[in-house]
């Protein structure tokens, strides 16, 4: 009789464990990339003339463009100046979550679209490299609410918080920083526009 009772208890416990495991597996895990998807990421000085803008999707893939307008670089063939341009795609992956507001993100792949120099409507378009992002780089992602005191002066410049009338104590937007490239992308909802 004891053997039957033990078997029943074992079967009951096994069934409960399997149900709990199934329930845990059924819960969708939200990746940090799910949160970043649907934002416009912009790296710019705020003064205009140049920017790198990209979109990051939920699977970690991304695409973007870089442009730098040099209206003083002109000639008879292109009297309205020169624009350096680049379109690119790539893939990122999560290295690790550092704390509740910080993640390390690696740029696993970066490809630029092959284009040729051309003159169109008085402007010379020159192929360039993506500015601010590079393959193999490990970038640091900061969530809104991160104290601005953790940032270097260069990082603060790229967050654009110092341009606000009253410098906030915490980030209001997402911020993706690269020490290697000395760059910082601010994440904005796509509906409100990219540049500050």
Language-model region placement:
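Edge beta-strand at a domain terminus
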Residues: 84-97, 133-196
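Generic recognition of cysteine residues
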Residues: 21-24, 44, 74, 86
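Sec-dependent N-terminal signal peptides of Gram-positive bacterial secreted proteins and lipoproteins
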Residues: 4-27
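Short, solvent-exposed secondary-structure boundary motifs
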Residues: 39-48, 81-85, 129-131
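Tryptophan-anchored aromatic micro-motifs
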Residues: 28-53, 172-196
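N-terminal glycine/threonine-rich, aromatic-flanked beta-hairpin/loop signature
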Residues: 48-117
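Long, charged/polar, surface-exposed segments that mediate recognition or autoinhibition
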Residues: 97-146
């Amino acid at each position: 009789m004891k053997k039957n009772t033990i078997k029943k208890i074992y079967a009951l416990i096994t069934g409960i464990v399997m149900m709990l495991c199934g329930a845990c597996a059924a819960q969708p895990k939200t990746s940090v990339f799910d949160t970043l998807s649907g934002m416009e990421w912009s790296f710019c000085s705020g003064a205009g003339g140049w920017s790198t803008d990209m979109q990051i999707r939920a699977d970690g893939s991304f695409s973007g463009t870089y442009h730098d307008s040099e209206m003083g670089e002109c000639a008879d063939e292109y009297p309205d100046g020169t624009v350096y341009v680049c379109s690119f795609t790539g893939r990122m992956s999560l290295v690790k979550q550092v704390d509740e507001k910080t993640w390390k993100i690696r740029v696993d792949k970066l490809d630029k679209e092959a284009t040729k120099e051309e003159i169109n409507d008085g402007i010379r378009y020159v192929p360039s490299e993506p500015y601010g992002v590079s393959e193999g780089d490990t970038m640091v992602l900061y969530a809104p609410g991160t104290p601005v005191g953790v940032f270097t002066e260069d990082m603060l410049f790229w967050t654009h918080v110092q341009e606000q009338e009253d410098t906030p104590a915490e980030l209001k937007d997402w911020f993706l920083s690269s020490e290697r490239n000395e760059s910082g992308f601010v994440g904005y909802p796509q509906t409100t526009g990219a540049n500050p």
